[in-house]
Regions:
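Conserved phosphoryl-transfer catalytic core
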Residues: 19-70
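Metal-dependent phosphoesterase signature
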Residues: 56-104
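Conserved SAM-binding loop
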Residues: 120, 180-181
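Substrate-recognition "cap/lid" segment bordering the active-site pocket of phosphatases
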Residues: 127-178, 189
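Asp-based phosphoryl-transfer active-site loop
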Residues: 2-21
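Substrate-recognition element of Asp-dependent hydrolases with the DxDx(T/V) motif
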Residues: 86, 95-138
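Short, well-ordered beta-to-alpha junction loops that form the rim of enzyme active sites
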Residues: 9, 123-127, 183
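Acidic, divalent-metal-coordinating active-site segment for phosphoryl/phosphodiester hydrolysis
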Residues: 183-192
Length: 192
Protein backbone atom coordinates (compact mmCIF):
# COMPACT_ATOMS: atom_id res chain seq x y z
CA UNK A 1 0.00 0.00 0.00
CA UNK A 2 1.27 3.46 -0.91
CA UNK A 3 1.89 5.56 2.19
CA UNK A 4 3.90 8.31 0.52
CA UNK A 5 4.48 9.89 -2.87
CA UNK A 6 7.94 11.10 -3.83
CA UNK A 7 7.80 13.34 -6.89
CA UNK A 8 10.28 14.93 -9.20
CA UNK A 9 9.59 18.50 -10.31
CA UNK A 10 10.93 19.16 -13.81
CA UNK A 11 8.65 17.45 -16.35
CA UNK A 12 6.49 15.97 -13.58
CA UNK A 13 4.80 18.75 -11.60
CA UNK A 14 6.22 21.60 -13.66
CA UNK A 15 6.94 21.85 -17.39
CA UNK A 16 10.53 21.15 -18.42
CA UNK A 17 10.26 24.40 -20.35
CA UNK A 18 9.82 26.35 -17.10
CA UNK A 19 13.18 25.20 -15.78
CA UNK A 20 15.00 25.28 -19.12
CA UNK A 21 13.41 28.44 -20.54
CA UNK A 22 12.86 30.51 -17.38
CA UNK A 23 14.93 29.42 -14.38
CA UNK A 24 18.21 28.41 -16.06
CA UNK A 25 18.45 31.53 -18.27
CA UNK A 26 17.57 33.70 -15.27
CA UNK A 27 20.41 32.22 -13.18
CA UNK A 28 22.81 32.41 -16.16
CA UNK A 29 21.98 36.08 -16.68
CA UNK A 30 22.28 36.98 -12.97
CA UNK A 31 25.16 34.74 -11.81
CA UNK A 32 28.06 37.14 -12.39
CA UNK A 33 26.36 40.11 -10.72
CA UNK A 34 25.17 37.90 -7.84
CA UNK A 35 28.58 36.33 -7.16
CA UNK A 36 30.40 39.66 -7.34
CA UNK A 37 27.86 41.30 -5.02
CA UNK A 38 28.01 38.43 -2.49
CA UNK A 39 31.59 37.14 -2.82
CA UNK A 40 32.36 37.85 0.86
CA UNK A 41 29.23 36.08 2.16
CA UNK A 42 30.40 32.86 3.94
CA UNK A 43 27.79 30.76 2.10
CA UNK A 44 29.03 32.04 -1.28
CA UNK A 45 32.68 31.63 -0.24
CA UNK A 46 31.96 27.94 0.49
CA UNK A 47 30.24 27.47 -2.87
CA UNK A 48 33.20 29.08 -4.67
CA UNK A 49 35.63 26.83 -2.77
CA UNK A 50 33.53 23.78 -3.70
CA UNK A 51 33.80 24.74 -7.39
CA UNK A 52 37.61 24.83 -7.07
CA UNK A 53 37.58 21.40 -5.39
CA UNK A 54 35.46 19.91 -8.16
CA UNK A 55 37.69 21.44 -10.83
CA UNK A 56 40.77 20.30 -8.83
CA UNK A 57 42.69 23.52 -9.49
CA UNK A 58 43.04 27.12 -8.36
CA UNK A 59 40.65 29.43 -10.17
CA UNK A 60 40.22 33.20 -10.20
CA UNK A 61 36.80 34.58 -9.35
CA UNK A 62 36.17 35.24 -13.05
CA UNK A 63 37.19 31.65 -13.93
CA UNK A 64 34.81 30.32 -11.27
CA UNK A 65 31.96 32.39 -12.72
CA UNK A 66 32.76 31.12 -16.23
CA UNK A 67 32.87 27.53 -14.91
CA UNK A 68 29.46 27.99 -13.28
CA UNK A 69 28.04 29.41 -16.52
CA UNK A 70 29.46 26.45 -18.45
CA UNK A 71 27.83 24.06 -15.96
CA UNK A 72 24.48 25.83 -16.48
CA UNK A 73 24.87 25.44 -20.28
CA UNK A 74 25.68 21.74 -19.79
CA UNK A 75 22.77 21.28 -17.32
CA UNK A 76 25.18 19.78 -14.78
CA UNK A 77 23.62 18.45 -11.56
CA UNK A 78 26.39 19.67 -9.27
CA UNK A 79 25.57 20.65 -5.68
CA UNK A 80 27.44 24.00 -5.51
CA UNK A 81 25.80 25.14 -8.76
CA UNK A 82 22.35 24.07 -7.57
CA UNK A 83 22.86 25.86 -4.23
CA UNK A 84 23.95 29.05 -6.00
CA UNK A 85 21.05 28.87 -8.45
CA UNK A 86 18.68 28.50 -5.49
CA UNK A 87 20.03 31.70 -3.95
CA UNK A 88 19.74 33.57 -7.25
CA UNK A 89 16.19 32.31 -7.79
CA UNK A 90 15.30 33.33 -4.23
CA UNK A 91 16.13 36.92 -5.12
CA UNK A 92 14.06 36.58 -8.29
CA UNK A 93 11.02 35.19 -6.48
CA UNK A 94 11.26 37.81 -3.73
CA UNK A 95 11.55 40.64 -6.27
CA UNK A 96 8.59 39.30 -8.26
CA UNK A 97 10.71 38.68 -11.37
CA UNK A 98 10.03 34.92 -11.05
CA UNK A 99 6.84 32.96 -10.39
CA UNK A 100 6.64 29.15 -10.32
CA UNK A 101 4.28 27.15 -12.51
CA UNK A 102 2.61 23.85 -11.54
CA UNK A 103 0.51 21.78 -13.95
CA UNK A 104 -3.18 22.07 -12.96
CA UNK A 105 -3.64 18.27 -12.95
CA UNK A 106 -0.51 17.80 -10.83
CA UNK A 107 -1.82 20.35 -8.33
CA UNK A 108 -5.22 18.60 -8.14
CA UNK A 109 -3.64 15.15 -7.60
CA UNK A 110 -1.15 16.40 -5.00
CA UNK A 111 -3.98 18.13 -3.14
CA UNK A 112 -6.11 14.96 -3.31
CA UNK A 113 -3.30 12.79 -1.90
CA UNK A 114 -2.60 15.34 0.82
CA UNK A 115 -6.28 15.37 1.82
CA UNK A 116 -6.24 11.53 1.98
CA UNK A 117 -3.33 11.68 4.42
CA UNK A 118 -0.70 10.41 2.00
CA UNK A 119 2.64 12.05 2.78
CA UNK A 120 4.14 13.98 -0.12
CA UNK A 121 7.85 14.53 -0.71
CA UNK A 122 9.90 16.21 -3.41
CA UNK A 123 13.11 14.73 -4.84
CA UNK A 124 14.76 16.99 -7.38
CA UNK A 125 18.24 17.80 -8.61
CA UNK A 126 17.44 21.42 -7.77
CA UNK A 127 18.40 22.40 -4.22
CA UNK A 128 15.86 22.07 -1.40
CA UNK A 129 15.91 25.86 -1.20
CA UNK A 130 14.99 26.14 -4.90
CA UNK A 131 12.25 23.52 -4.49
CA UNK A 132 10.66 25.41 -1.60
CA UNK A 133 10.91 28.70 -3.51
CA UNK A 134 9.23 27.28 -6.59
CA UNK A 135 6.35 25.83 -4.57
CA UNK A 136 5.96 28.96 -2.43
CA UNK A 137 5.34 31.15 -5.48
CA UNK A 138 3.14 29.20 -7.92
CA UNK A 139 0.14 29.84 -10.11
CA UNK A 140 -1.85 28.16 -7.26
CA UNK A 141 -0.21 30.19 -4.49
CA UNK A 142 2.02 28.74 -1.78
CA UNK A 143 1.91 24.92 -2.02
CA UNK A 144 4.62 24.08 0.51
CA UNK A 145 1.94 23.05 3.03
CA UNK A 146 1.36 19.96 0.88
CA UNK A 147 4.87 18.57 1.39
CA UNK A 148 6.30 16.71 4.36
CA UNK A 149 9.89 16.92 3.13
CA UNK A 150 12.31 17.75 0.35
CA UNK A 151 15.36 15.93 -1.03
CA UNK A 152 18.07 17.06 -3.44
CA UNK A 153 21.48 15.90 -4.68
CA UNK A 154 22.79 15.90 -1.10
CA UNK A 155 20.97 12.56 -0.60
CA UNK A 156 22.49 11.18 -3.81
CA UNK A 157 22.02 10.99 -7.56
CA UNK A 158 18.46 10.34 -8.77
CA UNK A 159 19.72 7.49 -10.98
CA UNK A 160 21.33 5.69 -8.01
CA UNK A 161 19.08 3.10 -6.28
CA UNK A 162 20.83 3.80 -2.96
CA UNK A 163 19.38 7.34 -2.97
CA UNK A 164 15.85 5.94 -2.77
CA UNK A 165 16.81 3.59 0.05
CA UNK A 166 18.22 6.56 1.97
CA UNK A 167 15.03 8.56 1.38
CA UNK A 168 12.85 5.66 2.55
CA UNK A 169 14.96 5.33 5.72
CA UNK A 170 14.79 9.09 6.25
CA UNK A 171 10.98 9.13 6.15
CA UNK A 172 10.61 5.88 8.12
CA UNK A 173 8.99 3.82 5.36
CA UNK A 174 9.86 0.76 3.32
CA UNK A 175 10.79 1.62 -0.28
CA UNK A 176 7.79 -0.42 -1.52
CA UNK A 177 5.44 1.94 0.37
CA UNK A 178 6.62 4.96 -1.64
CA UNK A 179 5.36 5.81 -5.12
CA UNK A 180 8.01 7.72 -7.10
CA UNK A 181 6.87 9.99 -9.93
CA UNK A 182 9.25 11.17 -12.64
CA UNK A 183 9.39 11.78 -16.37
CA UNK A 184 12.80 10.03 -16.50
CA UNK A 185 12.73 6.23 -17.03
CA UNK A 186 16.25 5.82 -15.57
CA UNK A 187 15.10 7.45 -12.31
CA UNK A 188 11.99 5.25 -12.21
CA UNK A 189 14.17 2.14 -12.66
CA UNK A 190 16.54 3.29 -9.91
CA UNK A 191 13.62 3.75 -7.52
CA UNK A 192 12.14 0.28 -8.21
Amino acid sequence: MVKAVLTDIEGTTTPISFVKDVLFPYSYEKIQEFVLKNKDNPQIVKILEDVKKIEERELSLEEIIQTLKKWIEEDRKITPLKELQGLIWEEGYKSGELKGYVYPDAYEKLKEWYEKGIKLYIYSSGSVKAQKLLFSNTNFGDLNYLFSGYFDTNIGNKKDPLSYTKIAQSVGLNPNEILFLSDNPDEILASA
